[in-house]
């Protein structure tokens, strides 16, 4: 049975601004997936739906889980504040589906349910600032290069758009709104009206009227939408108004208008409008010129391709794809047991990273590389030629092995390599680390990882569910001792596949083990330290 995806925009957050269709869709759903703050905002509308809530930067895992559950036959609601199609989850859900080869006719059904976007809800609190041409620009450069955002701000400022800035500032991103103000001041008066709206229609709503010059003197954060007026926007009685232009034709303080209805659309009543006849002539000339250019270009291209084909003796494609540069991330190490980098490897790292890339040594005995490139395959080839072990970065399975006393205690190495071969780099609900130690000393801390195996007296001990960070961090629970070497790989593999299949997005293994109570026949026991621990400020 096919499931269904309901991608819901629930507006600013107040129940009275949630559309009837959005309410119905929430009630229809078997499962609600969303950012945890958004789930809390609609808590009063939930009944017995299964809830999966995750933190910021987990949008992809939410979309993937939603698709997975819908393909399993469930009706899944993916929620966004505002409108799901405006910086929301709608596009990402489509992208995940497309990656899986989804087709509208044969795949799971998808419905996008619109909501009130921030530009609309904030405008209603400010007055009527978006009565004329407007645009939205997100200042978050986590996914969009800042150079491109700058161009968009510049274009909007030059064109006299009313601009609504989303995601203007965060704890780490503080310069973007400063740069946006600088660009706008090149084209607009310092007295241009600006409205700052925080948490529109929520409990901690704040509305501030200011101007372009002074806007940074007020608190601006991730929950703020910054609305910058155009050259005609004005303040009146604590309201921000952008005229539509009616004053050009109408007398707003009189009931008797100078132009009769049949006169208002005549050419002489709109001297500022585009001359339609001249525009048609110019358009026809432009089209003819473009057509001639295209024909000339096509002829030249055909001739060039014919010559190239004669040289190469094979057909060539007329389509040329411009390479797109992006940040390529990969983790490298000398090997699972080997912890020693060679001079050749270090030289190779310097070469492939270059001036623009970065290298970061991690606690997992790897070096994480971030390299701007349009050709990641060439980088992979160079790293492999230098005998690096390559691992993907993110929510994947990673082995953190000891050095087996520089190879002297090597009995566990073949099993380590087999686990890497079968599972290394596999996608997980959350990053999953398997610690492996080659003797009972466990000096590399295998018992402190999500899953730990320790080779001792010719067999393996198995530890599950360590909590690796926080004041209440603890070692894994020992669930089995003396596992035969021939069995350990299969046991670990089954545990990991069960976590991959049943774990929630962003759910760490120790939380998964606690929730399901039993993993591959191993029972959970609460070994959390019995002390009062305040929640970590980061939300751990």
Curated annotation (Swiss-Prot):
Entries under Gene3D superfamilies matching the protein: Cobalt-precorrin-4 Transmethylase, Domain 1, Methyltransferase, Cobalt-precorrin-4 Transmethylase, Domain 2, Sulfite Reductase Hemoprotein, domain 1
Pathway the protein takes part in: Cofactor biosynthesis; adenosylcobalamin biosynthesis
GO biological process: cobalamin biosynthetic process; methylation
Cofactor comment: Binds 1 [4Fe-4S] cluster.
Pfam families: NIR_SIR, TP_methylase
An example molecular function term from Gene Ontology annotations: oxidoreductase activity
Residues that, per the record, bind [4Fe-4S] cluster: 402, 405, 439, 443
Key words, A-Z: 4Fe-4S, Cobalamin biosynthesis, Iron, Iron-sulfur, Metal-binding, Methyltransferase, S-adenosyl-L-methionine, Transferase
Documented EC number(s): 2.1.1.272
Reactions that this protein is recorded to catalyse: Co(II)-factor III + AH2 + S-adenosyl-L-methionine = Co-precorrin-4 + A + S-adenosyl-L-homocysteine
Record InterPro entries: 4pyrrol_Mease, 4pyrrol_Methylase_sf, 4pyrrole_Mease_sub1, 4pyrrole_Mease_sub2, Cbl_synth_CobJ/CibH_dom, NO2/SO3_Rdtase_4Fe4S_dom, NO2/SO3_Rdtase_4Fe4S_sf, NO2/SO3_Rdtase_FeS/sirohaem_BS
Cofactors demanded by this protein: [4Fe-4S] cluster
Parts of the chain that traverse the membrane: none
Broadest EC class assigned to this enzyme: transferase
Impact noted for substituting residue 402 to A: No iron-sulfur cluster formed. Low activity with cobalt-factor III as substrate. Normal activity with Co-precorrin 3
Domain of life the protein comes from: Bacteria
Role: Is also able to convert cobalt-precorrin-3 to cobalt-precorrin-4.
Family per similarity comment: In the N-terminal section; belongs to the precorrin methyltransferase family.
Protein name: Cobalt-factor III methyltransferase
Organism (species): Priestia megaterium
């Amino acid at each position: 049975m096919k499931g269904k995806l309901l991608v819901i925009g629930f507006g600013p957050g107040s129940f009275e601004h949630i559309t009837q269709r959005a309410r119905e869709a929430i009630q229809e759903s078997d499962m609600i997936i969303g950012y945890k703050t958004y789930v809390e905002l609609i808590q009063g509308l939930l009944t017995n739906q299964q809830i999966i809530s995750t933190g910021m930067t987990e949008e992809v895992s939410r979309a993937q889980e939603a698709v997975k559950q819908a393909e399993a036959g469930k009706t899944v609601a993916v929620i966004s504040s505002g409108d799901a199609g405006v910086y929301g989850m709608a596009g990402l859900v489509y992208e995940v589906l497309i990656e899986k080869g989804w087709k509208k006719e044969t795949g799971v059904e998808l419905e996008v349910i619109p909501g009130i976007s921030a530009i609309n809800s904030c405008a209603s609190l400010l007055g009527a600032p978006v009565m004329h041409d407007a645009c939205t620009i997100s200042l978050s450069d986590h996914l969009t290069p800042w150079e491109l955002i700058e161009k968009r701000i510049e274009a909007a400022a030059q064109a006299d758009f009313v601009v609504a800035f989303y995601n203007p500032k965060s704890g780490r991103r503080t310069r973007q709104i400063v740069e946006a103000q600088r660009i706008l001041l090149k084209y607009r008066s310092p007295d241009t009206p600006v409205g700052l709206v925080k948490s529109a229609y929520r409990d901690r709503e704040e509305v501030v009227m200011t101007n372009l010059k002074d806007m940074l003197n007020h608190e601006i954060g991730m929950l703020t939408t910054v609305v910058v007026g155009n050259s005609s926007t004005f303040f009146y009685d604590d309201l921000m108004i952008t005229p539509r232009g009616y004053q050009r034709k109408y007398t707003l303080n009189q009931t008797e208008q100078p132009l009769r209805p049949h006169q208002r659309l005549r050419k002489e009543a709109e001297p500022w409008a585009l001359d339609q006849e001249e525009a048609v002539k110019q358009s026809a000339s432009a089209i003819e010129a473009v057509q001639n250019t295209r024909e000339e270009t096509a002829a030249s291209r055909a001739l060039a391709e014919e010559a190239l084909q004669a040289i190469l003796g094979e057909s060539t494609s007329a389509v040329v794809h411009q390479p797109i540069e992006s940040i390529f991330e990969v983790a490298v190490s000398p090997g699972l047991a080997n912890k020693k980098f060679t001079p050749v490897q270090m030289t190779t790292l310097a070469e492939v990273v270059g001036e623009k890339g970065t290298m970061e040594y991690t606690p997992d005995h790897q070096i994480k590389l971030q390299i701007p490139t349009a050709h990641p395959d060439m980088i992979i080839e160079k790293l492999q030629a230098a005998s690096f072990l390559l691992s993907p970065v993110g929510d994947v399975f990673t082995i953190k092995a000891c050095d087996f006393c520089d190879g002297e205690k090597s009995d566990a190495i073949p099993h380590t390599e087999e686990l890497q071969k079968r599972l290394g780099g596999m996608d997980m609900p959350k990053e999953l680390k398997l610690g492996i130690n080659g003797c009972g000393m466990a000096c590399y801390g295998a018992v402190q990882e999500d899953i730990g195996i320790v080779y001792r007296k010719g067999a393996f001990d198995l530890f599950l569910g360590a909590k690796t960070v926080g004041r209440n961090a603890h070692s894994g629970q020992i669930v089995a001792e003396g596992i035969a070497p021939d069995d350990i790989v299969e046991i670990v593999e089954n545990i990991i596949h069960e976590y991959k299949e049943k774990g929630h997005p962003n759910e760490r293994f120790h939380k998964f083990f606690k929730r399901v109570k039993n993993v591959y026949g191993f029972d959970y026991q609460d070994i959390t330290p019995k002390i009062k621990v305040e929640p970590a400020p980061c939300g751990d």
